[in-house]
């Protein structure tokens, strides 16, 4: 029987135990620190040991919580110095706190063991908080990682089910998916019907119906019926495997802002450390007040720790990507999220993106005493032997039972229509050209689409309009994009000028370009890119079918309805797991909210640190204020970064 990977479970459990151990250690150190601090403040140590015995007693007692809380920081700092990598937060904390304890050697100044122990304690509290914050922000992506099934059920000759690792299932194998189980591999349903929960992949809370003959993708939960599924892909190429690979690799693609912060920290930390040394040595040499200037230098060191930036900025991007995943929006890296925030031009492919990509009857105009239903029935009977999509849409619109015995002598005139004898009457269903051959002038119709005219015994019975229907949320999406500051919305299509103009007008698009071949779309996007000014970016949205060249060329390629589409997942920078255009505007809002949070944290952290550095140099800031400048600012920045995960109201 297949089971989940025990190594992953063991690693996860070990990490959790390590975090709990650190938390308990810090709580013990905090308790001891509180007791010692109270004894020191209330004069108990002075009463017990006198002067200067109270100072040495205080030194020893504060050293206990200091070592309990910070031994791992001191150990890491020592190891890094041995490796030649001194300038990190562990080194800064070690030097600053040991220096605070060493101030006891200067009899002309107040002892600072309490500050030294407090700096280490609160630094560790901040580190613990950061660990919890990162863990929380990973939950949405961890939930996404849980879509990977542990096994697949394969029916044996004796009728029993054997649980097999999905990797071991060959293409074409029929697997059994019980109610409540995840679909392990992409395939087609050969027996059964059910409701599918696709929330983990698409963010869609409404279950989707599925029946025999329907395609089914891995990662969905079978909610009701027992399914027999014939696999169409190996597990490694299934939707769930591709999505997991995408999510796991997202952290490798860094945003420009993220890379800047990393480079900045490499310069900032040694620069401030050097400034601290110059401040302490220079001030001491000039004034002779060594204890005062060394204390200022130590305060500099505490504030110089860059953790508020190096933690909160990546955490903001991580939270934004995780929050987007809740909506079924997979962003391949923080660099694409950053670019998405600057998008001011959105280019759409029409079919399958703004429209449903399927023909359907949008209007029925009967004449000569026919009703809508009777006109549809005559047309559906005439088209009953055709497999053309237009014929199928007419039969679907009729919805009633069709008796093929009523039809005789059916002929198909390619590019024009069909002629058939129905109940002894000669019926012609076709376009305006076929009508002209019969000597009848086609009436005008204001509705744009493919028009089927119906003649019964040379009498005009009416016409049926068939079109690719616009998606229900497409019009609102365009309004939302304009409201979000997108300056230009453009539609590219291979359809006629008339159809394109109708769709563009209905949706409120800024411009459209019709009768384009796939290669023409790339050229059109190139021209739009050349017209971009400033930092504005261009996003192209397609359904993943034949859109790879344009998706790749755009600043941001967005593939819609990508469930099961390997080409789309490969070519796009952002993958929308369902076919709702509304998620495009939501993805842009997530990106802009994330970038706003990133810059809030950068400005806040640098502003506070710069202020405290100036105050420390002037001798106004003490070690306690430095603790706020480091740990306090880091915690506030992290709390702000966690807001990036909140996407419910976007």
Identify the function of each model-found stretch.
Residues 89-94, 201, 260, 295, ...:
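Conserved catalytic phosphorylation-site environment of P-type ATPases
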Residues 30-31, 259-290, 296-314, 599-628:
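Bilayer-spanning, highly hydrophobic alpha-helical transmembrane segments
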Residues 424, 456-600, 608:
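Conserved ATP-binding TGD loop and adjacent catalytic N/P-domain core of P-type ATPases
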Residues 77, 112, 133, 152, ...:
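Residue-level signature of catalytic and energy-coupling elements of molecular machines
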Residues 2-16, 62-151, 170-175, 182, ...:
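Actuator/coupling domain of P-type ATPases
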Residues 78-88, 129-143, 315-334, 642-650:
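Juxtamembrane helix-loop transition segments at the membrane interface in multi-pass membrane proteins
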Residues 1-54, 64, 161-163, 241, ...:
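Flexible metal-binding regulatory segments at protein termini and peripheral loops
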Residues 178, 365-488, 497, 509-525:
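P-type ATPase nucleotide-binding
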């Amino acid at each position: 029987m297949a089971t989940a990977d025990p190594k992953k479970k063991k690693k996860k459990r070990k990490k959790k135990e390590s975090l709990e151990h650190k938390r308990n250690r810090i709580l013990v150190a905090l308790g001891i620190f509180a007791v010692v601090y109270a004894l020191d403040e209330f004069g108990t140590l002075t009463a017990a040991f006198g002067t200067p015995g109270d100072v040495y007693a205080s030194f020893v007692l504060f050293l206990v919580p200091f070592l309990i809380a910070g031994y791992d920081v001191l150990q890491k700092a020592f190891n890094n110095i041995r490796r030649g990598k001194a300038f990190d937060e562990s080194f800064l904390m070690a030097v600053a706190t040991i220096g605070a304890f060493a101030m006891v050697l200067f009899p002309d100044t107040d002892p600072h063991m309490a500050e030294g122990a407090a700096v280490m304690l609160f630094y560790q509290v901040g580190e613990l908080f950061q660990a919890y914050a990162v863990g929380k922000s990973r939950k949405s992506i961890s939930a996404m990682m849980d879509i990977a099934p542990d096994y697949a059920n394969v029916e044996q000759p004796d009728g029993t089910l054997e649980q097999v690792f999905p990797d071991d299932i060959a293409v074409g194998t029929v697997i059994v998916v019980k109610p409540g189980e995840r679909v392990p591999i992409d395939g087609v349903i050969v027996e059964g019907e059910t409701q599918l929960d696709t929330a983990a992949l698409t963010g869609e809370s409404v279950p989707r119906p599925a029946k025999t003959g329907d395609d089914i993708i891995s990662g969905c939960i079978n909610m009701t019926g027992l399914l027999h599924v014939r696999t169409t892909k190996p597990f490694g190429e299934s939707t769930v495997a591709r999505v997991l690979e995408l999510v796991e690799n997202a952290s490798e693609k860094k945003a420009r802002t993220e890379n800047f912060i990393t480079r900045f920290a490499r310069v900032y930390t040694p620069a401030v450390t050097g400034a601290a040394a110059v401040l302490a040595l220079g001030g001491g040499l000039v004034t002779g007040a060594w204890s005062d200037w060394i204390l200022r230098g130590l305060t500099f060191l505490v504030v110089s720790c860059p953790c508020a930036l190096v933690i909160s900025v990546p955490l903001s991007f991580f939270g934004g990507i995780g929050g987007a995943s809740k909506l079924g929006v997979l962003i391949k890296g923080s660099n694409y999220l950053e670019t998405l925030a600057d998008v001011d031009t959105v280019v759409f492919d029409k079919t399958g993106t703004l429209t449903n990509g399927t023909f359907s009857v949008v209007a029925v105009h009967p004449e000569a005493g026919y009703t809508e239903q009777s006109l549809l029935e005559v047309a559906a009977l005439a088209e009953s032997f055709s497999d053309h999509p237009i014929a199928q849409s007419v039969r679907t619109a009729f919805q009633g039972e069709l008796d093929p015995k009523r039809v005789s002598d059916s002929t198909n005139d390619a590019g024009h229509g069909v002629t058939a004898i129905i109940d002894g009457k000669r019926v012609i269903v076709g376009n305006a050209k076929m009508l002209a051959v019969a000597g009848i002038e086609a009436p005008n119709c204001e509705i744009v689409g493919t028009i089927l005219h119906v003649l019964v015994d040379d009498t005009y019975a009416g016409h049926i309009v068939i079109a690719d229907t616009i998606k229900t949320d497409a019009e609102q999406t365009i309004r939302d994009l304009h409201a979000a500051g997108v300056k230009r919305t453009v539609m590219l299509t291979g359809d006629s000028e008339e159809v394109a103009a109708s769709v563009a007008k209905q949706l409120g698009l800024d411009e459209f370009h019709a009768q384009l071949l796939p290669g023409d779309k790339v050229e059109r996007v190139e021209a739009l890119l050349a017209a971009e000014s400033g930092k504005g970016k261009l996003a192209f949205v397609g359904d993943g079918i034949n859109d790879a060249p344009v998706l790749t060329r755009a600043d941001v390629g967005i593939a819609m309805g990508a469930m099961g589409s390997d080409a789309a997942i490969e070519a796009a920078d952002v993958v929308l797991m369902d076919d709702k255009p509304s998620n495009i505007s939501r993805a842009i809002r997530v990106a802009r909210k994330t970038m706003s949070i990133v810059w809030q944290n950068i400005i806040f952290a640098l502003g506070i640190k710069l202020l405290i550095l100036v105050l420390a140099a002037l001798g106004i800031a003490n070690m306690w204020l430095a603790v706020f400048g480091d740990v306090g600012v880091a915690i506030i920045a992290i709390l702000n970064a966690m807001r990036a995960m909140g996407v419910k109201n976007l």
